[in-house]
């Protein structure tokens, strides 16, 4: 009897616990890239700013030093100097005090490099020349580097500057007539002069390839003081170790604790298609000599130029993985530090490189256009989002197949022009990031700015500016609450995607491009992998989800208990090979063994066969919603977002079995509801732009009440009437109080100051409710809000509307008169454009200073006024 009671007690406890929100932690809160301009930071300012960041829901700071502020050179602090290390130690102490995690870029700007990198360890490129000669007797050929040298990949730095670094590596002769012959003439070169007498006495025609290694002379981009210098050769183990030695020395000599995580930004090492040891490394890894196949590599000629190209690109991938990514991570681990890495851009198998670190990180770059109803648009002042679902899934796939708990994302890079990004514009792309498997968001980003610096303060050019100097900061805490609430669920449990999809990287490498180097940059994936992108998006549209897998991790995958299991123990229902793809004989043999054991392996996207193996999610196929599913000890949980122009109210079948289900509203962690069920289906109601968390249970759970529904058949229009508009926070200050016959945006009013102000306008009105009307529950629909709004009823704070639809559930209503107060905060666009019209010199930064979304230097005086305030209607809507 006691055992039965104990079992019942445990089941009841599990049921109660299952209905609760997962706990928050530092990692469930948002992080941000913290730009230190010139590293000109100061203790008192740091203390105040870190309190402010923490109170607004930013709990991880990734320090990235960059170029400084003009005229402030005296306050710059050299990277890794004793003073810099002292400041880092202080920041780490403040982090503990403010419950914050401190990360650190393993360099300044990007990529890795700096003053201690000698030219012989800097980025390397190949240059070559081809001479066709007819040899009758002894011949001489002057091979001194000159303008006849060709490059195989483009860089930012070409011409004489690079030619001066060219060193002859190999001279190979290929006989063009019969019999074919290849000879290595390198040893016959003295002081760049080739002297050769072929053993074949009769005249013969030869193609002579002279291969040079040169340095690209790329310098660290956006470097901070103390970080200027050459970019390292990432393929060279010695160069990487030498670079990391500088950090060992700085931390040891200054007794500074290491940060929680070291970070590496996206691979932006341009034209670095070579390394001094490549010939030996190629022969060791590929089993033949690259120098014997130079016509295939450089001219696309010969017996099998495609295979040589693939092998060359795979060798670079191997060297980058072993000599840079793994060495860097092993070094960090020796100091009990984690690594977070953006592999995109690498000339490499992205899955292997993302998987080699502790936290794979992808990047959201640009603004998606989902057509969401009511979402503000800024047609000519946004960048299109190159980071579609297929791109975002590289990092999460690597984390999933290796059992790593976190996938991070550099979020909101270059969404819009400066000063024009609203909180409402962030949510759709954030939801897309979450649906791709990301569960650790870092904002891009936050610039340290002294509190006494005149507005707009210190700015970094490509960021949304999530900082106290931006007007969106006033309501940003509600946005970061949303991030935290979503990540509490998304970091809980394990991934539960249906299929593994083989990444056909050799087919990508086989594509002959204008550059020998193939960099998998976000903006070029549509060129490098169009077929793979098409297949991934097709799988998604059929109602399934997948993770990508590479050769190395597929070779470690087994078939157990009817499931494919990666070496980390993550299970999948089947493997999809996307068509006729190139793969090694070793991998083919492994797949044959798996298939013989009964493992389902699909050699094309076969919807009927996929349907037999997994249940498609009608959330996708019927409703067109975005979603991701994870498993947990009592069932499953979904993050679901309506990134469509349509409102959804639909009963749908789920892809998993369940007994009960609940809904959690990530906009408010105090709210959850019992799901309506019918015939084994669940009811999903989401307006355009909304998101929800659905949790299923393998047991019954107590009823938590129904999800309230807006009934637009019963409304009370407050748009017209006796409104007042005043300003409590504004710059420039707006002193008048305006009486309005109906709600309208304030830049349309006649007052000069209100047209250009940045701040918070307070709309106030009084409305009445009858006893009959009070019998209803009400919500308020604020229509088109520019840009966020806090709502108060009869003096009580109701909530903040910062995302579409701008609707809040009301409380504290009463029969008779009710006082409504709506505090609307706008963007800084009107203020900054007015400053440019007056010629205020706020662009004061070194290096690139401030550029627009097209990387051009421009000013904003031509901007038309941006709507600010309530831009349409205000209605009470009955809740059912």
Segments (PLM) and residue ranges:
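Bacterial Sec-dependent N-terminal signal peptides
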Residues: 1-20
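Mature N-terminal segment immediately following signal peptide/propeptide cleavage
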Residues: 19-60
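Carbohydrate-binding surfaces of carbohydrate-active enzymes
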Residues: 30-31, 42, 47, 60, ...
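Acidic/aromatic-lined carbohydrate-recognition and catalytic surfaces
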Residues: 66-187, 200, 208-212, 220-221, ...
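An acidic-aromatic loop/edge-strand motif
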Residues: 112-119, 130-141, 145-181, 607-611, ...
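Extended acidic/polar, glycine-enriched regions
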Residues: 160-165, 169-252, 678-711, 817
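Short aromatic-centered micro-motifs
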Residues: 173, 564, 620-621, 789-795
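Aromatic-lined ligand-binding clefts that engage carbohydrates, nucleic acids, or primary amines
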Residues: 653, 767-794, 801, 820-824
């Amino acid at each position: 009897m006691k055992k039965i009671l104990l079992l019942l007690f445990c089941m009841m406890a599990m049921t109660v616990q299952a209905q609760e929100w997962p706990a928050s932690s530092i990692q469930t809160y948002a992080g941000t890239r913290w730009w230190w301009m010139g590293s000109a930071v100061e203790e008192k300012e740091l203390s105040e700013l870190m309190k402010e960041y923490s109170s607004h829901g930013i709990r991880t700071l990734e320090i990235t030093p960059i170029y400084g502020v003009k005229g402030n050179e005296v306050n710059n602090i050299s990277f890794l100097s004793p003073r810099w290390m002292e400041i880092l130690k202080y920041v780490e102490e403040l982090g503990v005090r403010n419950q914050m995690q401190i990360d650190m870029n393993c360099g300044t700007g990007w990529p890795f490099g700096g003053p201690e990198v000698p030219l012989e360890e800097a980025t390397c490129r190949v240059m070559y020349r081809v001479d066709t000669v007819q040899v009758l007797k002894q011949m001489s050929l002057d091979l001194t580097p000159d303008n006849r040298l060709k490059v195989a990949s483009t860089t930012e730095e070409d011409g004489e500057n690079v030619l001066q670094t060219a060193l002859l590596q190999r001279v190979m002769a290929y006989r063009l007539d019969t019999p074919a012959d290849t000879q290595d003439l390198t040893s016959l070169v003295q002081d760049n002069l080739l002297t050769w007498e072929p053993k074949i006495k009769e005249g013969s025609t030869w193609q002579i390839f002279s291969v040079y290694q040169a340095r690209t002379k790329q310098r660290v981009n956006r470097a901070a003081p103390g970080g200027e210098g050459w970019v390292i050769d990432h393929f060279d183990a010695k160069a990487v170790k030498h670079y990391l030695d500088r950090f060992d020395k700085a931390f040891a000599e200054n007794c500074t604790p290491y940060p929680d995580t070291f970070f590496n930004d996206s691979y932006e090492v341009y034209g670095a298609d070579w390394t001094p040891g490549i010939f030996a490394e190629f022969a060791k890894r590929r089993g033949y000599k690259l120098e014997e196949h130079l016509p295939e590599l450089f001219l696309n000629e010969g017996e099998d130029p495609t295979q040589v190209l693939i092998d060359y690109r795979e060798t670079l991938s191997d060297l980058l993985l072993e000599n840079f990514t793994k060495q860097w991570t092993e070094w960090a681990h020796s100091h009990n530090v984690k690594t977070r890495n953006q592999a995109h851009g690498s000339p490499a198998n992205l899955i292997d490189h993302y998987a080699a670190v502790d936290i794979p990180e992808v990047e959201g770059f640009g603004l998606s256009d989902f057509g969401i109803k009511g979402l503000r648009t800024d047609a000519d002042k946004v960048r299109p989002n190159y980071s579609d679902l297929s791109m975002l899934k590289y990092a999460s796939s690597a984390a999933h197949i290796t059992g790593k708990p976190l996938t991070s994302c550099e979020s909101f890079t270059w969404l819009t022009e400066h000063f024009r990004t609203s909180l409402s514009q962030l949510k759709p792309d954030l939801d897309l990031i979450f649906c791709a498997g990301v569960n650790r968001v870092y904002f891009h980003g936050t610039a340290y700015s002294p509190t006494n610096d005149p507005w707009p303060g210190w700015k970094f050019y490509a960021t949304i500016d999530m900082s106290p100097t931006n007007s969106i900061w006033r309501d940003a805490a509600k946005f970061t609450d949303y991030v935290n609430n979503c990540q509490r669920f998304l970091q809980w449990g394990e991934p539960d995607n249906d299929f593994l999809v083989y990444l056909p990287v050799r087919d990508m490498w086989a594509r002959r491009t204008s550059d020998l180097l193939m960099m998998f940059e976000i903006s070029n994936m549509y060129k490098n992998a169009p077929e793979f992108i098409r297949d991934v998006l097709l799988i998604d549209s059929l109602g399934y989800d997948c993770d990508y897998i590479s050769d190395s991790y597929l070779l470690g995958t087994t078939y157990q208990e009817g499931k494919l299991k990666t070496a980390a123990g993550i299970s999948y229902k089947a493997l999809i090979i996307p068509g006729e793809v190139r793969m090694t004989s070793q991998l083919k043999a492994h797949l044959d063994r798996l298939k013989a054991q009964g493992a389902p392996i699909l050699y094309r996207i076969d919807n009927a066969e996929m349907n037999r193996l997994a249940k498609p999610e009608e959330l996708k196929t019927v409703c067109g919603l975005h979603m991701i599913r994870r498993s947990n000890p009592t069932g499953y949980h979904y993050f679901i977002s309506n990134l469509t122009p349509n409102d959804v109210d639909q009963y749908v079948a789920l892809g998993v079995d369940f007994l009960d289900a609940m809904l959690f509203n990530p906009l408010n962690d105090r709210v959850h509801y019992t799901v309506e069920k019918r015939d084994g289906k669940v009811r999903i109601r989401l307006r355009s732009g909304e998101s929800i968390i659905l949790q299923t249970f393998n047991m019954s759970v107590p009823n938590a009440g129904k999800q309230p529904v807006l009934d637009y058949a019963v409304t009370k229009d407050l748009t017209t009437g006796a409104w007042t508009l005043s300003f409590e926070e504004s710059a420039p200050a707006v002193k008048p109080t305006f009486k309005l016959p109906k709600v309208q945006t304030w830049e349309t009013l006649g007052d000069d100051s209100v047209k250009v102000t940045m701040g918070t306008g307070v709309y106030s009105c009084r409305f009445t409710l009858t006893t009959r009307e009070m019998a209803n529950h009400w919500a308020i629909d604020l229509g088109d809000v520019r840009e966020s709004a806090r709502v108060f009823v009869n003096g009580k704070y109701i909530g903040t509307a910062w995302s579409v639809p701008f609707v809040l559930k009301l409380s504290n209503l009463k029969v008779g008169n009710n006082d409504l107060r709506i505090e609307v905060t706008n963007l800084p666009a009107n203020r900054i454009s007015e400053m440019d019209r007056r010629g205020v010199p706020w662009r004061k930064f070194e290096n690139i200073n401030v550029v627009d979304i097209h990387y051009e230097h421009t000013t904003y005086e031509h901007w038309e006024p941006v709507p600010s305030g309530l831009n349409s209607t205000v209605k009470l809507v009955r809740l059912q």
